[in-house]
Curated annotation (Swiss-Prot):
Pfam families: Ribosomal_L14
Family of the protein in this entry: Belongs to the universal ribosomal protein uL14 family.
Key word Cell cycle present: no
Major subcellular site: plastid
Protein name: Large ribosomal subunit protein uL14c
Purpose of the protein: Binds to 23S rRNA.
Lineage of producing organism: Eukaryota, Viridiplantae, Streptophyta, Embryophyta, Tracheophyta
Subunit structure, as described in the record: Part of the 50S ribosomal subunit.
Keywords: Chloroplast, Plastid, Ribonucleoprotein, Ribosomal protein, RNA-binding, rRNA-binding
Gene: rpl14
MF terms in GO: large ribosomal subunit rRNA binding; structural constituent of ribosome
GO terms, biological process: translation
Length: 122
């Protein structure tokens, strides 16, 4: 469960290292975001000499959360960290690689480009 002011790791090579959620895209008073939700975030930490800079406002899709994700078949998935992938306005990832495992639910939410870049889909 990601809410405003939550810090997330970045799971791609876009140049950002850490994000802070400032808004959840969707309903106007939505409190929490889960895997597959799009958030508006600010870059808190970035690598030098990359297109993304610190304090830049971007969009990202959440790919891992510490909060459990319960599937219809009864399986429960939980990750060690909260992580997101930086995307552009069309929903395409800004990076060319995705690090770590991501959830299978992203494929059903039409983030197929992110799923194809991921090394492992759980």
């Amino acid at each position: 469960m990601i809410q405003p002011q939550s810090h997330l790791n970045v799971a791609d090579n876009s140049g950002a290292r850490e994000l802070m959620c400032i808004r959840i895209i969707g309903a106007s008073n939505r409190r929490y975001a889960h895997i597959g939700d799009i958030i508006v975030a600010v870059i808190k930490e970035a690598l030098p000499n990359t297109p993304l800079e610190r304090s830049e406002v971007i969009r990202a899709v959440i790919v891992r959360t510490c909060k459990e994700l319960k599937r219809d078949n009864g399986m429960i998935i939980r990750y060690d960290d909260n992580a997101a992938v930086v995307i552009d306005q069309e929903g395409n990832p800004k990076g060319t690689r995705v690090f770590g495992a991501i959830a299978r639910e992203l494929r059903q939410l039409n983030f197929t480009k992110i799923v194809s870049l991921a090394p492992e889909v759980l």
